[in-house]
Amino acid sequence: MTRKTKRKGFIQTLDGNTLAMKLIASIIRLEDLIIFLEGKGRQVSYAKLSDKEGRTVADADACTDAVINSDSFINLGKGNHVRCSTIEAVETCNGQDHKGILIRGEGDAILSFLPISQLEAREKVAEALHDALVSYEAGKFVQPDLTKILSTH
């Protein structure tokens, strides 16, 4: 099913809501879920995927593609994306329980977390994300190849 847009810049999400695409700051894909967050980390759309028309994996992919094609999004892998313009900070987390990269938005809201167990890989991913944000700010966005970085560690 193709995502229907009633007006340019808007999208009908899998949960039936119509949202301005510029509102969506983060796309989180889990096994059978698709979640959209806005810049302050609040959930604006949540849908459980199934075989039902309008809620399939293909529908989620089409919805994701429509949103990420509307602006510059960093691809974090596994269907997760974050809008460049909403990223306020990229932090490495070296905690005992959680190790990875935290991406923060407005008011320190967590927009995404990328689990990475190895310190060297965390540092390289953080550097790649920083470089991507610098390229975005310069008007020449370059998508970081996080898959390549993570596959070598």
Question: Which functions belong to the PLM regions below?
Answer:
Residues 2-17, 22-81, 85-153:
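Acidic, Ser/Thr- and proline-rich intrinsically disordered linker/docking segments
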